Amino acid sequence: MQDKLIVRGAREHNLKDITVELPRDRFVVITGVSGSGKSTLAFDTIYAEGQRRYVESLSAYARQFLGLMEKPDVDSITGLSPAISIDQKTTSHNPRSTVGTVTEIHDYLRLLYARVGTPYCPICGRKIEKQSPSEVTDRLLAGFPDKRAILLAPAVRGRKGEYKKLFADLRREGYARVRVDGTLYELEEAEKLKLEKFEKHDVDIVIDRLTLRESDRSRIAESVELGIRRGEGLLRVLLPDAGEDGGAHEELYSEKFACPEHGSVLEELEPRSFSFNSPYGACGDCAGIGAKQEFSPERIIDEKLSIAGGAIIPWTKKGADAGIYYWDKLKALAEHLDFDLKTPWKDLPAKAQKAVLHGPGEAFEVVYRRGGKETMRFMTEFEGVITNLERRYADTESEFMRERLEELMELRPCPTCGGTRYKPEILAVRVGGLNISQTSGMSVLDADAFFQQLQEGELDHAAIEPFLKRHTGGTAKAHGPLHYEYDLGTFGAAVAAPILRAIRTRLKFLVDVGLDYLSLDRTANTLSGGEAQRIRLATQVGSGLTGVLYVLDEPSIGLHPKDNGRLIGTLKNLRDLGNSLLVVEHDEDTMLEADYLIDMGPGAGVHGGEVIASGTPEQVKQDKNSLTGKYLRGEMKIEVPAERRPGNGKFLKVFGARQNNLQDVDVSIPLGTMTVVTGPSGSGKSTLIHDILHATLARELNGAKTTPGLYDRIEGMEQLDKVIEIDQSPIGRTPRSNPATYTGVFTEIRDLFTRTPEARRRGYQAGRFSFNVKGGRCEHCKGDGVMKIEMNFLPDIYVPCEVCHGARYNRETLEVKYNHKTIADVLDLTVEDAHEFFEAIPTIERKMQLLLDVGLGYMKIGQPSTTLSGGEAQRIKLATELSKRATGRTIYILDEPTTGLHFEDVRKLMDVLQRLAEGGNTLVIIEHNLDVMKSADYLIDLGPEGGVRGGTVVAVGTPEEVAAHPTSYTGEYLRKVPGIVAAEPRARGEKAEKPAKAKAPAKKRTKKQTELVEAD
């Protein structure tokens, strides 16, 4: 078998006809500066070809569903295995997808509860026992005397099919009627029905039609017994006139599960009963999502204003006449409940607030007056603002109105199920004393301990008590058991053994990749890219496949240095199973642990696309041409700043933060500094900074419609004028967006073209040089430059427009030139070339210089934003912020800005961040990178662990002070950083005070805070 994967003549994107040999069944890391071609080689060439060859082997019919990848621009690839990509861009956005469902642990939980779960009555908590036919007969006669009844035996429940054969068989057996999907039919009629084959149906056999009289007990008992036998333990009884208002009512009886006191019946327990994606288990109110979009009083009411002053926001907006229409009713309501419409909302009594929002629930008198005279007097009702908005939202057919109303809504836990997603009768089924929602709500680590104790028969009440008070339901609450059962019994233990083994194996893999803090019910759309990737990595390790090529994109993202060892161990386990690993990575530990290292470069974009060095980590480390090698051997490094900024003496203070796992923490951020928030994965960093601090600042300073997490108060906001979050999200969602449009430089370039003699002679305005509007763009391709051709079972192809040949503009527009270049030529310039070309235009030259400063000189200014990496998008945003005049009152929030960045890129990034801080601005950065930590003025370390074991402030202070902290994991790793000398930690009570001006043992600070230096 070939022992090498050989790529010959790769020219995809910026690759320069490279040939590279990779050892098979080894752990290979590809590194290099951002934009050097790492992902192009790993994903767009090697993975794309592996996937394409596999899909091409399938039938043409199958290919049109899978989507064939385009053949990469490469001469040949040999030694290629089937490829699986584990990147960060395929996180599920489905609210039904959770950690448990993605890892398949939830599937095993459903099986466990269906096979060994103990059902209890959701009303009284009594253990549900079987019902015999005689007990069912007694219940019917006692509960519905002299009522007409139709006894039905369930034959089909929620299954697909046409059931013609079933109907024919039933007629031969002597039955006369059936009920199909809730409608009664003669069997002759039923046989003529054309049921949808691929839709789910319910079919019940009519056993008997009778009146429930004591004199007919023997007939009733006989029919009940037959019905239960024919329905395999279940019997439905339809009572046509026993319901409310004389309507129909239906009873369900089970030979197996029913509470003798309340009659609570549980259908036969099956795995689908415990799925929140199935109508058999899901809460009927929220359909198993666990949350509902509801109108938020916080978004509807401005508490600082009075009703007369416009407190009811949707009724005071321009164009909303509801305020005028309801004004007389509101005045009458105020008289009725004795409150003043001119009183600020926050000072109104709770009863008045409730009446305005939800209606008073009673009629009251309204007097209409016009010109001071009474014109009408009558009794009326007031539905309430929220009820009014709900009605309008349900009735409107206008997409615009729907979107406007959705701005006033937010996702809130379902009031019926309390966010558990399940019906109360499903929550009443327990294993080891806990229901399925309670076990899903545990962290991975707690769940592993619980199932181990269950497996070993060592469970007791003390072990499950911390989990009993939550996940019991909302208004449809499930009563706790009267008597708990902790063990499974001999039979149950034998049935559960293989299920528990499978659950614990998968939990162990999640622990190994550093995700022990996640709960199994955590929705997938709330996971970071790194977390989602490591979950899929754990799933792949659990699959036990061999001979596969795994291509991974920075699996260490979001991991604290303390968790890196476990991740690397998992990657090696995957390799040891007999797989090849190709990992795009910038983490130093991962590089040094690899079997083989490839360094791409030397620069980015047109300056990259070459293999600079390859070999073992030690060989690359000693390579004189390798930039990565210079950093690995310490010849180049990011220097520790000579001193820490003390800040401007003012603070932004958060008190009582307690969202998610935060444990009532107080933190102080010194303004005018670069503050880095650190801590293990899941310790509460994003909750504190994003969910509480950023959400509050965005609402108060920027007027955003955000809903912050739980906290007591935030002080110091008056010192700031705006908050800006600089993340790695795309700068635009369409190919029409590009660096030139985002930075605003395209507007200036178009204005420049309008001032050329030719444009003036023709009367062209700035719009003529836009490819987004009619006039100057090529109308054949609508300014896209390419035409999409659908190929059905072949991949769609994009070909240059045959009219403009990819230029995007029509011939007349391209006849206008500035310094011998058309507008299309200018958009095709790199930032470096554009900087030189527009040297005489200060406004454009300055913005190009800033893009150069952040390391984007290789990028074309007209490059579609959809092709930019997250790191590139973030640096464009940073350059745009640097181009603005510094006020010293802006706070910037960044979440792991070093994602996708090489050591050299981090150095450039730190230069830019230090420049922002030098302008007196405040930076708050969530980061695990030690180079960023050591460059900070102030650190806030959360922990000590993730999940329920985190959420507290472990240490605060300068990097030197945190390094001296005895229990901080961050401090432990900072102590190993050259140039950081541990200083005495400050007293805990001083955490909110002004950080000391700490000296670090480094050379005198130069103009740039972080610089590239040659080691002595």
From Swiss-Prot:
Domain ABC transporter: 315-627, 647-975
Composition bias type Basic and acidic residues, residue spans: 985-996
Protein's UniProt keywords contain Cell cycle: no
UniProt keyword annotation of Repeat present: yes
Residues at which ATP binds: 32-39, 679-686
Keywords, alphabetical: ATP-binding, Cytoplasm, DNA damage, DNA excision, DNA repair, DNA-binding, Excision nuclease, Metal-binding, Nucleotide-binding, Repeat, SOS response, Zinc, Zinc-finger
GO CC terms in record: cytoplasm; excinuclease repair complex
Annotated compartments: Cytoplasm
A molecular function GO annotation: zinc ion binding
Domain of life: Bacteria
An individual GO BP term: nucleotide-excision repair
Annotated segments matching region Disordered: 984-1016
Pfam families given in the database record: UvrA_DNA-bind, UvrA_inter
Zinc finger (C4-type): 259-286, 778-804
Similarity comment text for this entry: Belongs to the ABC transporter superfamily. UvrA family.
Quaternary data: Forms a heterotetramer with UvrB during the search for lesions.
Function: The UvrABC repair system catalyzes the recognition and processing of DNA lesions. UvrA is an ATPase and a DNA-binding protein. A damage recognition complex composed of 2 UvrA and 2 UvrB subunits scans DNA for abnormalities. When the presence of a lesion has been verified by UvrB, the UvrA molecules dissociate.
Protein's name in the database: UvrABC system protein A
Lineage, opening ranks: Bacteria, Thermotogati, Deinococcota, Deinococci, Deinococcales
Gene that encodes it: uvrA
